[in-house]
Protein backbone atom coordinates (compact mmCIF):
# COMPACT_ATOMS: atom_id res chain seq x y z
CA UNK A 1 0.00 0.00 0.00
CA UNK A 2 1.36 3.40 -0.92
CA UNK A 3 0.43 6.92 0.11
CA UNK A 4 0.40 10.06 -2.05
CA UNK A 5 1.85 11.94 0.92
CA UNK A 6 5.51 11.34 1.77
CA UNK A 7 6.11 10.96 5.48
CA UNK A 8 8.54 9.24 7.81
CA UNK A 9 7.32 6.93 10.59
CA UNK A 10 9.47 6.62 13.70
CA UNK A 11 8.77 3.91 16.27
CA UNK A 12 10.36 4.74 19.65
CA UNK A 13 11.16 1.58 21.62
CA UNK A 14 12.75 1.34 25.04
CA UNK A 15 13.35 -1.82 27.06
CA UNK A 16 13.12 -0.19 30.50
CA UNK A 17 9.40 -0.66 31.10
CA UNK A 18 8.54 -1.08 34.78
CA UNK A 19 5.24 -2.87 34.21
CA UNK A 20 6.39 -5.06 31.32
CA UNK A 21 10.18 -5.49 31.05
CA UNK A 22 11.63 -6.04 27.55
CA UNK A 23 8.27 -5.11 26.07
CA UNK A 24 9.50 -4.23 22.54
CA UNK A 25 10.93 -7.74 22.14
CA UNK A 26 7.84 -9.60 23.37
CA UNK A 27 6.86 -12.30 20.89
CA UNK A 28 3.72 -11.76 18.83
CA UNK A 29 3.15 -14.59 16.41
CA UNK A 30 6.84 -15.25 15.91
CA UNK A 31 8.01 -11.65 15.61
CA UNK A 32 8.99 -9.03 18.21
CA UNK A 33 6.29 -6.52 19.10
CA UNK A 34 8.33 -3.60 17.77
CA UNK A 35 8.57 -5.31 14.39
CA UNK A 36 4.79 -5.78 14.31
CA UNK A 37 4.42 -2.03 14.93
CA UNK A 38 6.92 -1.22 12.18
CA UNK A 39 4.94 -3.43 9.80
CA UNK A 40 1.79 -1.43 10.53
CA UNK A 41 3.67 1.80 9.87
CA UNK A 42 4.87 0.40 6.55
CA UNK A 43 1.29 -0.58 5.66
CA UNK A 44 0.33 3.04 6.31
CA UNK A 45 2.46 4.05 3.35
CA UNK A 46 5.37 5.66 5.18
CA UNK A 47 8.19 6.60 2.84
CA UNK A 48 10.62 5.43 5.51
CA UNK A 49 10.10 3.46 8.73
CA UNK A 50 12.68 3.82 11.50
CA UNK A 51 12.86 2.26 14.94
CA UNK A 52 14.57 4.48 17.52
CA UNK A 53 15.95 2.79 20.63
CA UNK A 54 18.71 3.06 23.21
CA UNK A 55 19.06 -0.75 23.30
CA UNK A 56 21.27 -2.59 20.83
CA UNK A 57 19.13 -5.74 21.25
CA UNK A 58 16.14 -3.87 19.85
CA UNK A 59 18.12 -2.46 16.93
CA UNK A 60 19.47 -5.92 16.06
CA UNK A 61 16.00 -7.51 16.18
CA UNK A 62 14.54 -4.81 13.95
CA UNK A 63 17.32 -5.02 11.38
CA UNK A 64 16.94 -8.81 11.20
CA UNK A 65 13.44 -8.17 9.87
CA UNK A 66 14.54 -5.64 7.27
CA UNK A 67 13.77 -2.35 9.02
CA UNK A 68 16.09 0.58 9.62
CA UNK A 69 17.03 1.46 13.18
CA UNK A 70 18.66 4.42 14.92
CA UNK A 71 20.56 4.27 18.21
CA UNK A 72 19.43 7.07 20.53
CA UNK A 73 20.42 8.28 23.97
CA UNK A 74 18.98 6.60 27.05
CA UNK A 75 18.15 9.79 28.95
CA UNK A 76 15.26 11.15 26.89
CA UNK A 77 12.37 12.27 29.12
CA UNK A 78 9.77 11.70 26.39
CA UNK A 79 9.17 10.07 23.05
CA UNK A 80 9.14 13.50 21.42
CA UNK A 81 12.69 14.13 22.63
CA UNK A 82 13.74 10.80 21.12
CA UNK A 83 12.16 11.77 17.79
CA UNK A 84 13.96 15.10 17.94
CA UNK A 85 17.29 13.28 18.19
CA UNK A 86 16.39 11.12 15.18
CA UNK A 87 15.39 14.19 13.13
CA UNK A 88 18.67 15.90 13.99
CA UNK A 89 20.81 12.82 13.30
CA UNK A 90 19.24 12.13 9.92
CA UNK A 91 19.03 15.77 8.85
CA UNK A 92 15.36 15.82 7.86
CA UNK A 93 14.23 18.85 5.86
CA UNK A 94 12.18 21.37 7.84
CA UNK A 95 8.92 20.37 6.15
CA UNK A 96 9.38 16.61 6.51
CA UNK A 97 6.39 15.09 8.29
CA UNK A 98 7.46 12.68 11.01
CA UNK A 99 4.84 10.40 12.59
CA UNK A 100 5.49 8.98 16.05
CA UNK A 101 3.99 5.48 16.11
CA UNK A 102 4.09 4.14 19.67
CA UNK A 103 6.15 0.97 19.97
CA UNK A 104 3.53 -0.80 22.12
CA UNK A 105 0.62 -0.54 19.67
CA UNK A 106 0.94 -3.51 17.30
CA UNK A 107 -2.75 -3.30 16.39
CA UNK A 108 -2.76 0.36 15.35
CA UNK A 109 -4.81 1.04 12.23
CA UNK A 110 -2.52 1.97 9.30
CA UNK A 111 -5.29 4.17 7.93
CA UNK A 112 -5.23 6.28 11.09
CA UNK A 113 -1.46 6.72 10.82
CA UNK A 114 -1.87 7.87 7.23
CA UNK A 115 -4.78 10.15 8.13
CA UNK A 116 -2.83 11.95 10.87
CA UNK A 117 0.09 12.57 8.50
CA UNK A 118 -2.29 13.90 5.85
CA UNK A 119 -4.06 16.04 8.43
CA UNK A 120 -0.83 17.82 9.31
CA UNK A 121 -0.09 18.41 5.63
CA UNK A 122 -3.54 19.98 5.27
CA UNK A 123 -2.92 22.40 8.18
CA UNK A 124 0.20 24.40 7.28
CA UNK A 125 -0.22 26.71 10.28
CA UNK A 126 0.10 23.78 12.68
CA UNK A 127 3.34 22.20 13.88
CA UNK A 128 1.67 19.02 15.11
CA UNK A 129 -1.31 16.85 14.24
CA UNK A 130 -2.91 14.18 16.39
CA UNK A 131 -6.20 12.29 16.65
CA UNK A 132 -9.23 11.94 18.89
CA UNK A 133 -12.52 10.08 18.99
CA UNK A 134 -15.88 10.91 20.61
CA UNK A 135 -16.80 9.43 23.97
CA UNK A 136 -20.33 9.34 25.31
CA UNK A 137 -20.36 7.82 28.78
CA UNK A 138 -19.83 9.75 32.01
CA UNK A 139 -17.43 7.14 33.39
CA UNK A 140 -15.18 7.79 30.38
CA UNK A 141 -15.39 11.56 30.70
CA UNK A 142 -14.47 11.45 34.40
CA UNK A 143 -11.65 8.90 34.00
CA UNK A 144 -8.33 10.77 34.45
CA UNK A 145 -6.56 8.11 32.38
CA UNK A 146 -8.67 9.21 29.40
CA UNK A 147 -7.14 12.44 28.16
CA UNK A 148 -9.78 14.78 26.76
CA UNK A 149 -9.26 17.47 24.13
CA UNK A 150 -11.40 20.53 23.36
CA UNK A 151 -11.36 21.79 19.77
CA UNK A 152 -12.03 25.14 18.15
CA UNK A 153 -14.28 25.65 15.11
CA UNK A 154 -11.41 24.64 12.80
CA UNK A 155 -10.52 21.40 14.58
CA UNK A 156 -7.45 22.85 16.28
CA UNK A 157 -6.84 21.91 19.92
CA UNK A 158 -7.71 24.49 22.56
CA UNK A 159 -6.62 22.35 25.50
CA UNK A 160 -5.87 18.78 26.58
CA UNK A 161 -6.73 17.62 30.09
CA UNK A 162 -7.26 14.64 32.32
CA UNK A 163 -10.18 16.55 33.82
CA UNK A 164 -13.73 16.28 32.40
CA UNK A 165 -13.71 18.95 29.69
CA UNK A 166 -15.83 20.58 28.49
CA UNK A 167 -17.74 20.70 31.78
CA UNK A 168 -21.48 20.29 31.17
CA UNK A 169 -22.47 22.55 34.03
CA UNK A 170 -26.23 22.07 34.14
CA UNK A 171 -25.94 18.30 33.68
CA UNK A 172 -23.11 17.67 36.14
CA UNK A 173 -23.54 20.11 39.01
CA UNK A 174 -26.75 18.57 40.44
CA UNK A 175 -24.91 15.25 40.83
CA UNK A 176 -21.47 16.45 41.88
CA UNK A 177 -19.41 14.81 43.38
CA UNK A 178 -21.26 11.52 42.77
CA UNK A 179 -19.58 10.51 39.52
CA UNK A 180 -21.58 7.28 39.33
CA UNK A 181 -24.77 9.33 39.03
CA UNK A 182 -23.49 11.63 36.29
CA UNK A 183 -25.53 11.71 33.08
CA UNK A 184 -24.00 11.55 29.63
CA UNK A 185 -22.33 14.79 28.48
CA UNK A 186 -24.58 17.33 26.79
CA UNK A 187 -22.00 18.44 24.20
CA UNK A 188 -19.35 16.54 22.23
CA UNK A 189 -16.43 15.20 24.27
CA UNK A 190 -13.33 13.85 22.56
CA UNK A 191 -10.77 11.43 23.92
CA UNK A 192 -7.23 12.00 22.71
CA UNK A 193 -5.45 9.24 20.79
CA UNK A 194 -1.69 9.26 21.43
CA UNK A 195 -0.58 9.34 17.80
CA UNK A 196 1.36 12.40 16.62
CA UNK A 197 2.67 13.82 13.37
CA UNK A 198 5.27 16.59 13.57
CA UNK A 199 7.03 18.92 11.20
CA UNK A 200 10.76 18.27 11.49
CA UNK A 201 11.48 21.94 12.11
CA UNK A 202 9.35 21.76 15.27
CA UNK A 203 11.14 18.62 16.45
CA UNK A 204 14.43 20.50 16.27
CA UNK A 205 12.95 23.25 18.44
CA UNK A 206 11.19 21.06 21.00
CA UNK A 207 14.20 20.13 23.19
CA UNK A 208 14.97 23.83 23.69
CA UNK A 209 11.49 24.63 25.03
CA UNK A 210 11.17 24.98 28.78
CA UNK A 211 8.69 22.69 30.51
CA UNK A 212 5.32 24.36 30.97
CA UNK A 213 3.51 24.53 34.34
CA UNK A 214 0.39 23.02 32.77
CA UNK A 215 2.48 20.21 31.30
CA UNK A 216 3.92 19.39 34.72
CA UNK A 217 0.49 19.53 36.36
CA UNK A 218 -1.34 17.37 33.81
CA UNK A 219 1.69 15.22 32.88
CA UNK A 220 0.88 15.74 29.19
CA UNK A 221 3.87 16.62 27.02
CA UNK A 222 1.78 18.08 24.18
CA UNK A 223 0.89 20.98 26.47
CA UNK A 224 4.47 22.20 26.26
CA UNK A 225 4.02 22.92 22.57
CA UNK A 226 0.73 24.72 23.16
CA UNK A 227 2.18 26.73 26.07
CA UNK A 228 4.86 28.02 23.74
CA UNK A 229 2.34 29.04 21.07
CA UNK A 230 2.29 26.07 18.71
CA UNK A 231 -0.97 24.85 17.19
CA UNK A 232 -2.11 21.21 17.14
CA UNK A 233 -4.55 20.01 14.47
CA UNK A 234 -6.80 17.16 15.58
CA UNK A 235 -8.12 14.50 13.22
CA UNK A 236 -11.41 13.20 14.60
CA UNK A 237 -12.17 9.55 13.92
CA UNK A 238 -15.44 7.92 14.90
CA UNK A 239 -13.88 4.75 16.23
CA UNK A 240 -11.67 4.12 19.24
CA UNK A 241 -8.34 2.54 18.33
CA UNK A 242 -7.28 -0.88 19.54
CA UNK A 243 -5.71 -0.67 22.99
CA UNK A 244 -1.94 -0.72 23.33
CA UNK A 245 0.10 -3.09 25.48
CA UNK A 246 0.97 -1.82 28.96
CA UNK A 247 0.61 -4.85 31.23
CA UNK A 248 1.18 -8.63 31.15
CA UNK A 249 -2.59 -9.07 30.77
CA UNK A 250 -2.57 -6.80 27.70
CA UNK A 251 0.27 -8.84 26.23
CA UNK A 252 -1.56 -12.13 26.78
CA UNK A 253 -4.67 -10.71 25.09
CA UNK A 254 -2.76 -9.62 21.97
CA UNK A 255 -0.69 -12.82 21.85
CA UNK A 256 -3.93 -14.80 21.83
CA UNK A 257 -5.17 -12.66 18.95
CA UNK A 258 -2.05 -13.35 16.89
CA UNK A 259 -2.33 -17.07 17.65
CA UNK A 260 -5.91 -17.10 16.42
CA UNK A 261 -4.92 -15.31 13.22
CA UNK A 262 -2.26 -17.94 12.53
CA UNK A 263 -4.78 -20.77 12.55
From Swiss-Prot:
Keyword Disulfide bond applies: no
Task: Please provide, in alphabetical order, the Gene Ontology terms of the cellular component aspect for this entry.
Answer: cytosol
Q: Could you say which EC number(s) this protein's record lists?
A: 2.7.7.38
For this UniProt record, give its keywords in alphabetical order, as a comma-separated list. Cytoplasm, Lipopolysaccharide biosynthesis, Nucleotidyltransferase, Transferase
SUPFAM superfamilies the record matches: Nucleotide-diphospho-sugar transferases
Provide one Gene Ontology biological process annotation: CMP-keto-3-deoxy-D-manno-octulosonic acid biosynthetic process
Reactions catalysed, as given in the entry? 3-deoxy-alpha-D-manno-oct-2-ulosonate + CTP = CMP-3-deoxy-beta-D-manno-octulosonate + diphosphate
**Principal localization?**
cytoplasm
Q: Where in the cell is it found?
A: Cytoplasm
For this chain, the family text in UniProt reads: Belongs to the KdsB family.
Q: What does this protein do?
A: Activates KDO (a required 8-carbon sugar) for incorporation into bacterial lipopolysaccharide in Gram-negative bacteria.
> Could you tell me which PANTHER family the record lists for this protein?
3-DEOXY-MANNO-OCTULOSONATE CYTIDYLYLTRANSFERASE, 3-DEOXY-MANNO-OCTULOSONATE CYTIDYLYLTRANSFERASE, MITOCHONDRIAL
Q: What is this protein called?
A: 3-deoxy-manno-octulosonate cytidylyltransferase
Q: Which organism is it from?
A: Burkholderia mallei (strain ATCC 23344)
Q: What's the name of its gene?
A: kdsB
Amino acid sequence: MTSPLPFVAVVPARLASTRLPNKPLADLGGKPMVVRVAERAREAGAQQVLVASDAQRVLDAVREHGFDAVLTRADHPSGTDRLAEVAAKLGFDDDTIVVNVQGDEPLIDPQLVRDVASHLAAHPSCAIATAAHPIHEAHEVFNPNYVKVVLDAHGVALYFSRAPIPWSRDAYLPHWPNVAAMPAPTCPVYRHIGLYAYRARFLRTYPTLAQAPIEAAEQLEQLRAMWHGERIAVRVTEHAPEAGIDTPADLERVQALFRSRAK
